[in-house]
């Protein structure tokens, strides 16, 4: 997908860029049976208190039900019926029509087009968009939508432009290099989809104006130094101040490089190399 720029008729359009939707199927509303209503919580938890700040408002959305698993469709070919926009994620989605008549959405890989035939299973051909166990994917291939637990469905590499690379296979585990630089062992029976995720230009768009952030449900971010002492550790002082201490969160936890990962996690033994800083 290309990037669309605007003539600066107003100051808010000067730096605004959006994605052009030329690659998407024309005139396709989301399949009603694969959508459901999405209730926005405005960052509140079950007790009504703010648990995630700066959330609220935004345009209404229908949630698209995505098949991250594809295990129950092993060896059943599916035709790509359309490639559609999904407001709930950065990647586009593809509508598959299986040979048995069932329809499902998957994350759209880079390079597939309407009419392509995809398949999942241990014996599926090595082709972009096909889902196979990691042990059946050749070393050096890029993959996405990777399972961490057999049968749970893909959890890693699901956003636009994302991919991981198969580096090695030894015993029951396959070494995978994630796009962050982290190298990780994943059980060889876990499923991954071959190829990169499409819509890679998503990372290059410029919002351009505050109003678009509001359309997306993002509210303004107030600096701690602009608050009162009761609201933030950086608050208060006479006139403009620097905060007077090393940067911390509103609850006093150090920020900007402070490691928050627990020292002893069960998954540490699967991480060969931590992500790049």
Swiss-Prot record:
SMART domains: Ribosomal_L2, Ribosomal_L2_C. One of 8 loci used for multilocus sequence typing (MLST) in Borrelia burgdorferi. One of its GO terms (biological process) is cytoplasmic translation. One of its GO terms (molecular function) is transferase activity. GO terms for cellular component: large ribosomal subunit. Keywords: Ribonucleoprotein, Ribosomal protein, RNA-binding, rRNA-binding. InterPro entries: NA-bd_OB-fold (IPR012340), Rib_uL2_dom2 (IPR014722), Ribosomal_uL2 (IPR002171), Ribosomal_uL2_bac/org-type (IPR005880), Ribosomal_uL2_C (IPR022669), Ribosomal_uL2_CS (IPR022671), Ribosomal_uL2_dom3 (IPR014726), Ribosomal_uL2_RNA-bd_dom (IPR022666). It holds the Pfam family Ribosomal_L2_C. Residues 258-277 have a biased composition (Basic residues). The keyword Nuclease does not apply. Residues 32-58, 225-277 are annotated as: Disordered. Part of the 50S ribosomal subunit. Forms a bridge to the 30S subunit in the 70S ribosome. Belongs to the universal ribosomal protein uL2 family. One of the primary rRNA binding proteins. Required for association of the 30S and 50S subunits to form the 70S ribosome, for tRNA binding and peptide bond formation. It has been suggested to have peptidyltransferase activity; this is somewhat controversial. Makes several contacts with the 16S rRNA in the 70S ribosome. This is Large ribosomal subunit protein uL2.
